[in-house]
């Protein structure tokens, strides 16, 4: 895989972020335990990638010191990433393209997260990339991290490839590494999946870089 996330153009972990609301483990949601078929060979041309801009609609996500909301940072970053991947020949889907709840307003955590994963699974995606911004009660904490859940054999590989390209983007406090996370969207996606934490919105400098 080679997936480039250029956050500068858009603009351990204290908090494995709560994606939507904290769901209980679900049953009956499409996309359990790596049953899908996906391609890891070759370049990006012809690959199917689903991008998930975190939060949206009734869920603002984390909020920075100036009031900047996570949902308003993840969407333009995701749109930029979509364009960059398409320019390299990938077919890209997004779980949302506007400021909306994916399942519907004020959905339960399981419904909202399940709706996002189901989009990736329905398109038989080769990779799922969820974009988020971290937050912590210490405003000096910062940096970029990538989470994975080892279910397909390629999740950690994808996380490492992406993290190595984005870890030292100017304006952010460096490399927080890859970390395994028992997160719903990573567990329930059929394909290799990562969740990228592009800095800390609680850090004034990083909030500024995200705008």
Language-model features, listed with the residues they occupy:
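Catalytic-core regions of hydrolytic enzymes
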Residues: 20-160, 168
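Active-site-adjacent mobile loop/cap segments within catalytic or ligand-binding domains
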Residues: 130, 135-137, 174-211
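Proline/glycine-rich low-complexity loops and linkers
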Residues: 161-176
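Envelope-exposed proteins and targeting segments
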Residues: 1-3, 45-49, 88-90, 125, ...
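Short glycine-/small-residue-rich flexible loop motifs, especially phosphate/cofactor-binding loops
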Residues: 82, 117, 163, 183, ...
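Non-catalytic surface loops within mature trypsin-like serine protease
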Residues: 9-11, 150, 200-202
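A generic structural signal for short coil/turn motifs at secondary-structure boundaries
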Residues: 9, 45, 61, 205-206
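Surface-exposed edge beta-strands and adjoining flexible/disordered loops or tails in beta-rich
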Residues: 1-25
């Amino acid at each position: 895989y080679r997936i480039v996330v250029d956050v500068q153009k858009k603009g351990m972990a204290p908090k494995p972020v709560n994606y939507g609301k904290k769901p209980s483990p679900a049953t009956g949601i499409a996309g359990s335990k790596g049953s899908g078929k996906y391609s890891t060979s070759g370049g990006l041309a012809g690959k199917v990638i689903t991008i998930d801009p975190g939060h949206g609609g009734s869920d603002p996500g984390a909020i920075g010191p100036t009031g900047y909301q996570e949902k308003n940072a993840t969407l333009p970053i995701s749109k930029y990433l979509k364009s960059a991947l398409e320019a390299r020949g990938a077919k890209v889907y997004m779980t949302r393209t506007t400021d909306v709840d994916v399942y519907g307003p004020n959905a339960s955590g399981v419904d909202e997260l399940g709706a996002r994963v189901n989009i990736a699974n329905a398109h038989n995606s080769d990779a799922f990339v969820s974009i988020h911004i971290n937050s912590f009660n210490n405003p000096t904490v910062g940096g970029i991290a990538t989470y994975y859940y080892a279910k397909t054999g390629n999740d950690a590989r994808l996380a490492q490839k992406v993290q190595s390209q984005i870890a030292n983007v100017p304006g952010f406090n460096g490399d927080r590494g890859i970390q395994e996370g028992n997160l719903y969207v990573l567990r329930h996606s059929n394909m290799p999946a990562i969740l990228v934490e592009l800095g800390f919105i609680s850090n004034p400098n990083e909030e500024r870089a995200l705008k």
